[in-house]
Design a protein with these regions (language model features):
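Secreted/periplasmic serine-hydrolase-like ester/acetyl group-modifying domain
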Residues: 72-73, 82, 86-204, 300-322
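Well-ordered, non-membrane alpha-helical segments in soluble/globular domains
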Residues: 54-55, 185-195, 229-242
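Active-site segments of SGNH/GDSL-like serine hydrolases
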Residues: 199-225, 254-258
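Short catalytic/ligand-binding loop motif for oxyanion handling, primarily in non-cytosolic enzymes
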Residues: 26-27, 77-82, 215-220, 261-264
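Histidine-centered active-site loop/cap adjacent to the catalytic His
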Residues: 266-313
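Substrate-gating cap/lid alpha-helix
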Residues: 218-253
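Membrane-embedded segments
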Residues: 12-104
């Protein structure tokens, strides 16, 4: 989508955009339109960092009058605040149309041109509603429904790694959050540059931030390797909520205090949830629920932490050893 988004944004009549990682790639633009109004399209980029999405946002605002943006605030990217290389595609979004030809100078497109092919592989799909859906693909559906589904279908590398970690676990360590000793100023500057700047520059556009609820298992395993990770996430989320409170055209929504993330049956791996959560997120935006504020963020984070601590790894380990 880093390449395809250019044509979609330029050539289609949309005024509202879903932009995030794979966590919102299966959010229905049609459903968003029905629940929120507006003409929606999903232009999310799998595994995208904030600096990548900033390239897309800049182009969107140059091309369109934007009513609304739904943006996934992935906690992994939030606390890493790392840059991802964009040089091999960001020239598509500059003001020079002539250099766009560079994207076609590769074996794939040269072969397509020589064959005058109109196949989907060469020209893409016109069905923008399902173009980037992943949760309805057969190879993903087989992992939903319980941890036994993970054990039955081990092709996914992410699932293989989880099974390996649990199998090799000698003792079950409790979820202990190590206090953060480093500053988060770098992350705050990163968020200000690649995210808050757009909110401030475009006060007539509504920004809705979704915190994707990773499974409790993800946090338990992440804590073993990075014991201060959750402390950093808490500090940054509290700061983010405080900042959003000062921006009248932005809201942030959280779902980690629900029971949903307790059930691994809702996930195809450690972080990717089923489409019912995408619908719940749209409902929250439409109904004004699950909004995080300075008044409720402490209780929200405490509930989230308590649920992570209470998550029992023993049944999963026992199932592996059967």
């Amino acid at each position: 989508m880093r390449v395809q988004d250019k044509g979609i944004i330029k050539n289609y009549d949309f005024d509202s955009f879903i932009l995030g990682t794979s966590m919102v790639m299966s959010t229905s633009a049609r459903e968003a339109g029905e629940k929120l109004g507006g003409k929606w399209v999903n232009v999310s980029l799998a595994g995208s960092h904030f600096n990548e999405r900033a390239v897309i946002l800049q182009y969107i605002f140059r091309q369109k009058s934007v009513a609304r943006v739904i943006y996934s605030l992935d906690t992994a990217q939030l606390h890493e605040a790392s840059m991802k290389e964009t040089a091999n595609w960001d020239f598509l979004y500059d003001n020079n149309e002539f250099n766009d030809i560079k994207i076609y100078i590769n074996q794939k497109y040269i072969l397509c041109a020589l064959q005058f092919s109109s196949s989907t592989k060469c020209v893409g799909s016109k069905d923008l509603e399902t173009l980037i859906y992943w949760a309805t693909r057969v190879e993903e559906i087989i992992y939903f429904g319980g941890f036994n589904k993970w054990l039955e279908n081990k092709k996914k590398i992410a699932v293989q790694e989880v099974i390996k970690k649990l199998r090799e676990m000698q003792t079950i360590s409790p979820f202990n959050t190590k206090p953060l000793t480093e500053s988060v100023e770098r992350q705050q500057r990163y968020i200000e540059k690649y995210l808050f700047s757009f909110i401030k520059e475009h006060p007539s556009t509504q920004f809705d931030f979704i915190i994707p609820p990773y499974s409790r298992l993800w946090y338990r395993l992440d804590n073993l390797e990075f014991p201060d990770s959750f402390s950093k996430i808490k500090i940054l989320l509290k700061w983010f909520v405080q900042e959003v409170q000062t921006l009248p055209n932005a809201k942030i929504y959280g779902f980690d205090d629900l029971d949903y993330a307790d059930d691994i049956a809702n996930y195809s791996d450690l972080i990717h949830y089923n489409t019912d959560m995408n619908s719940m997120q749209l409902d929250a935006i439409a109904n004004g629920t699950h909004i995080l504020t300075p008044e409720n963020i402490d209780e929200y984070l405490q509930t989230m932490e308590n649920k992570i601590k209470a998550y029992d790894l023993a049944p999963l380990i026992q199932e592996i050893k059967k």
